């Protein structure tokens, strides 16, 4: 993970010029550094903080598999990624994690921030941290495709209802 257990922010936004791949125990992944967009990241941070969200500002941040693997799946193995990225880390590692409602509201606040920005840029905001896998215990490697399909349908068709789903349901079902 990009964070160790000494500091785990609930929400953190990367505001740096670039982000190096994290060493997750086997050395950093052999992928390009991720180029950021500090001017837009700072605009988003200021906007969502004014919108009552407390973000941890990361001026130096490494990015883990939660960002570098999806980038690799989308773009292969280029010498440099074809887009700039603003990483947004969400604590899903230790209790207490934010509720679905809180994450949904933050997503809406980020959208307002991006829409209010006065420049036309090619930048992606990536939220990392999620329910896609558990590395230990009896559910290690389990994929619940029925839950996943229902989740993605609800994400598109009824995000308000999905935002009310209790955290424990994700732990049991995802």
Regions found by a protein language model. Give the residues of each.
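Beta-strand elements within well-structured catalytic alpha/beta cores of enzymes
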Residues: 1, 88, 121-129
């Amino acid at each position: 993970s990009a964070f160790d257990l000494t500091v785990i922010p609930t929400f953190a936004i990367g505001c740096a010029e670039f982000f190096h791949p994290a060493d997750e125990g086997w050395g950093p992944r052999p992928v390009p550094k991720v180029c950021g967009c500090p001017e837009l990241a700072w605009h988003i941070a200021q906007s969502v903080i004014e919108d009552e969200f407390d973000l941890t500002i990361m001026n130096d941040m490494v990015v883990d598999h939660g960002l570098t693997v999806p980038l690799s799946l989308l773009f292969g193995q280029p010498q440099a990624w074809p887009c700039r990225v603003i990483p947004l880390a969400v604590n899903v590692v230790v209790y207490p994690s934010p509720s679905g409602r809180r994450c949904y509201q933050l997503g809406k606040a980020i959208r307002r921030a991006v829409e209010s920005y006065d420049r036309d840029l090619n930048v992606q905001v990536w939220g990392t941290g999620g329910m896609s896998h558990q590395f230990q215990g009896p559910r290690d490697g389990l994929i619940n495709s029925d839950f996943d399909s229902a989740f993605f349908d609800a994400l598109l068709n009824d995000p308000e209802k999905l935002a009310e789903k209790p955290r424990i349901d994700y732990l049991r079902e995802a």
